[in-house]
UniProtKB/Swiss-Prot annotation:
Is inhibited by AP3 (DL-2-amino-3-phosphonopropionate) and, to a lesser extent, by L-aspartate or AP4 (DL-2-amino-4-phosphonobutyrate). Is also inhibited by EDTA in vitro. One of its GO terms (molecular function) is L-serine ammonia-lyase activity. One of its GO terms (biological process) is D-serine biosynthetic process. This is Cysteate synthase. Its cofactor is pyridoxal 5'-phosphate. Keywords: Coenzyme M biosynthesis, Pyridoxal phosphate, Transferase. Its EC number is 2.5.1.76. InterPro entries: Cysteate_synthase, TrpB-like_PALP, TrpB-like_PALP_sf. The keyword Transferase applies.
Length: 416
């Protein structure tokens, strides 16, 4: 008897424990259903605490995990009495030890463990930067081969707090290619013998890893928050928070009302925001993504750009927003930079661009009256502590093994 099954959200078909991304009948998301219906915390230092609701057999022993703390300075500035910060990054003084400084590492640990338990040998993924860094780090720790395809804009984000190992294979793309081009090339590489696609939002282990931010908050606060703030590019983090909330509601000890998802995109590239404002389930490229590549290049937080986000799919972001009566925002670079300066000066830790975008949306929400001053609010600071990390670690840049000019390059040229 396994710990969980995977269930299709459209047709209901069930699959036993395995590394599976899709249903054989349709394109809906799969969702894990666990034997453990109550969250029983394990004695592990990081994400492994939440083993009850992670789709792996062995408990994860990494010290990397989310932390939640009650804000004082920022809360006072905004007139909020119950503002909590979910922090994923490096801040040892607060017990935060994610050495890649991003909550993407919460995805990488369970995914690589599930791959190992399923007999997989090598994983292929596309990244705008942060995800690639996280998977490279876990590859360096475990020795599992990882093939990472990254657009040129993501290369500076591909550093590690240890020397890169031979198990890390970085493929860069020339300027003019974006994250979606990287996804397309990675998809082709993943079809080669011996390769397994990481799967993006379809990867249940990835979503469950990100969902631990919500689990940690509920355990820390004693209940689910009323509101959840996060910046989104693909929307996977928002979906993950929603799915974690559904489990917490079923547990029965953390409240019955789902947190309202308050999610943000970074102008000028905001396809999900555009579709949601018009009440549409579908993204219409000619309306929502005009001049997409140009707009992506102009975006402050480039990791928040995906031309094919899991918005419309059954179990995707549209469903999450509908179920939680959610709100979406669009934030400019200037608003994000102002929020970054405010957050860092008040809370005392540096944050990455996506977190600055999320912080800006909280300022907008307060101004618009979308939160009550006594509401319980969770602000997901999904990446931070980079400057703090550099005080303790020497960082190493990962060098590309090959650079390609387009996603349709003949695969034999890659010499994989």
């Amino acid at each position: 008897m396994g710990r969980f099954i995977l269930k299709c959200l459209k047709c209901g078909r069930e699959y036993s424990q395995e590394y599976r991304l899709t249903c054989e009948n349709d394109d809906s998301f799969l969702r894990a259903e666990y034997l453990e219906k109550k969250l029983e915390l394990r004695k592990q230092p990081g994400i492994g605490r939440f083993h009850s609701w992670l789709p792996v057999q062995e408990e994860l022993t990494t010290e990397a995990g989310p932390i939640t703390y009650k804000s004082e300075a920022l809360a006072r500035e905004l007139g909020l009495s119950n503002l909590y910060i979910g922090f994923s990054g490096y801040w040892p003084e607060k017990g935060a030890f994610i050495k890649t400084c991003s909550f993407k590492e919460l995805e990488a640990h369970p995914t690589m463990q599930l791959l190992k338990e399923s007999g997989g040998k090598a994983i292929v993924l596309a990244s705008a930067g942060n995800t690639g860094r996280a998977f490279a780090h876990v590859s360096a720790l475990t020795g599992t081969d990882v093939y990472i395809v990254v657009p040129d804009s993501g290369i500076p984000k591909l550093w590690l707090p240890e020397e890169p190992t031979d198990s890390i294979h970085l493929i860069s793309m020339t300027p003019g290619n974006d994250y979606t081009d990287a996804i397309n090339l990675a998809g082709r590489i993943a079809k080669l013998p011996g390769m397994v696609p990481e799967g993006g939002a379809r990867n249940v282990a990835r979503r469950e890893g990100m969902g631990t931010v919500m689990l940690d908050a509920a355990v820390t606060i004693g209940k689910m928050p009323d509101h959840y703030f996060q910046a989104v590019g693909s929307g996977t983090g928002g979906i993950s928070a929603w799915e974690a909330s559904l489990r917490l509601r079923e547990d029965g000890r953390f409240g019955s009302k789902l947190p309202k998802l308050q999610l943000t995109q970074n102008l000028p590239f905001v396809p999900m925001y555009n579709a949601w404002q018009e009440g549409r389930r579908d993204i219409i490229p000619e309306i929502d993504m005009k001049d997409a590549k140009k707009r992506i290049e102009e975006t402050y937080a480039t990791v928040l750009t995906n031309r094919a986000p899991p918005y419309s799919v059954t179990g995707g972001l549209y469903d999450a927003l509908v179920d939680t009566d959610g709100i979406m925002y669009a934030v400019s670079k200037e608003e994000a930079l102002d929020a970054k300066a405010l957050f860092e000066s008040l809370e005392g830790i540096d944050i990455l661009p996506p977190s600055a975008v999320a912080a800006a949306s909280l300022l907008k929400a307060v101004e618009a009256g979308n939160v009550g001053k006594d509401d319980t609010i969770l602000l997901n600071i999904a990446g931070g502590g980079f400057k703090r990390l550099k005080e303790d670690f020497t960082l190493f840049q990962i060098e590309p093994e090959i650079t390609v000019s387009n996603p349709d390059v003949p695969l034999e040229e890659l010499k994989l």
